[in-house]
Amino acid sequence: MSSHRQSPGRRYYPALLDLEGKRCVVVGGGEVAERKVQSLLECGAQVVVIAPQATQAIGDLARQGRIGLSVKSYTRGDLGGALLVIAAATPDVNARVAADAKRDRVLVNAVDDPEHCDFIVPAVARRGPVLIAISSHGASPALSRRLRQLIEGCVGPEYGDLAELMGRLRPEVIAIGDEDERRRIWEAILDSRALELLRDGRRDEAELEARRCISSARD
């Protein structure tokens, strides 16, 4: 765990976490907490919210059985069994959550308070299975969001479609024993008209184009 002291040279280790079925706690019930809850649910996390008051959307999720909701103030011990906690309450509460998380060896993100964070959440652009994360190491979330917007303008949904197509072809290509040959096939697909065809919505033709690349590389 980190010492929770932000230094000018601090650098975070980029990683993607598998949160499927993992207990994740969100302390706070406002709009920021609501967004954090939604993003955790998208990753399959088992979400528990702890807050004396919560937005209607959080309440609705609890009534639907999609999250756990403890309508109370945060207390020591609320992090039991959690992989991570997001502190999205008041600064005082967030500081207590961060201190408890450090003692309990639970990863903590305190909203707008990088000094108390073990991890920060990047701005994300998604295109199907493609995920592009942008971070300023907490220096300027606004800059990260602007960069995300620029990337989203350049990387269209066809890139997600191409990733899905290549994922379907992956077992067939992986079965080819030679590593250099596999690399040539992937490069040939990327250099082919497959992306252009997907951009035009011509999915079947794109797959045929990709399969031609496989056949040509093996001839």
Regions found by a protein language model. Give the residues of each.
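Hydrophobic beta-strand scaffold residues
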Residues: V47, L69, L107-V108
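Residue-level detector of alpha-helix initiation sites
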Residues: E31-V32, D92, G138
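Hydrophobic, well-ordered beta-alpha structural blocks that scaffold small-molecule cofactor pockets
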Residues: M1-A62
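E1/E1-like adenylate-forming module used to activate ubiquitin-like modifiers
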Residues: A110-G160
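Glycine-rich, highly charged phosphate/nucleotide-binding loops
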Residues: A62-G80
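Short loop/edge segments at beta-strand edges and connector loops
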Residues: A51, L69-S73, D112
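An accessory alpha-helical subdomain
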Residues: G138-D219
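ADP-ribose/adenylate-binding Rossmann-like module
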Residues: L84-T90, N94-V121
